[in-house]
Amino acid sequence: MEKLVIIGAGGHAKVALDIAILMHNWNEIVFLDDYKTGEIFGYPIIGKINDSHIYKYSHDFFVAIGDNQIRSEIQNHLINEDFSIISLLHPSATISIFSKIERGSIVMAGSIINPNVTIGQGTIINTNSSVDHDCNIGDFVHISPGVAIGGTSSIGSYTWIGLGSNIINNITIGSDCIIGAGSVAVSDINSNVTAVGVPCTPIEKS
């Protein structure tokens, strides 16, 4: 399709718009958002998220909402209703031809995706991040700007890796985790854990 609906109208949506324009795949780009009206950089907000069905057969869709859980709920609903969900890949990103990126994901400027990497649905690979060879990144993950992930590592679904964190090779981080900004993971992290620091250590629950 030559038309694109971006769901969401916040900061993440602004970046998605920029990438979509640079990809030159769509001659019309519009937004749906439940809280904002008007336009973003001259591109109109034309309705609310529930209006998606109006554009189902004429537009591609991208869900540009930073919250992993909300993004997954909206995207999974659209997938179940057979909407056309696309990924956005910045032209300056270096993406191996031997990697796999599932629909609804975004790879931002300056990022590197090396061979035999799998990135799940609805995942954010933010600015200047790197994912080395043989890594598996789950669904609806957020890899923040400047994160470096060593080879043969695994990041579970719904996990958020904070700004500038480093994960050495052969590390498994479970699902639904939060890794604090600037952390260095040198050992595995179980699911449903918040961990911070150098080395990255789970925070004790009070």
Predicted feature descriptions by range:
Residues M23-I40:
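NAD(P)-binding Rossmann-fold cofactor-contacting core
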Residues S87-I203:
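Structural signal for interior beta-strand "rungs" in well-ordered beta-sheet cores
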Residues K3, N27-I29, D60, S84-I85:
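Residues at the starts of beta-strands that form the adenosine-phosphate
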Residues E2-D18:
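Glycine-rich adenosine-cofactor-binding loop
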Residues G11-H12, Q69-I70, K100:
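Short alpha-helical
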Residues H12, T37, T201:
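Conserved Rossmann-like nucleotide-cofactor binding loop
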Residues K36-T94:
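Phosphate-bearing ligand-interacting subdomains
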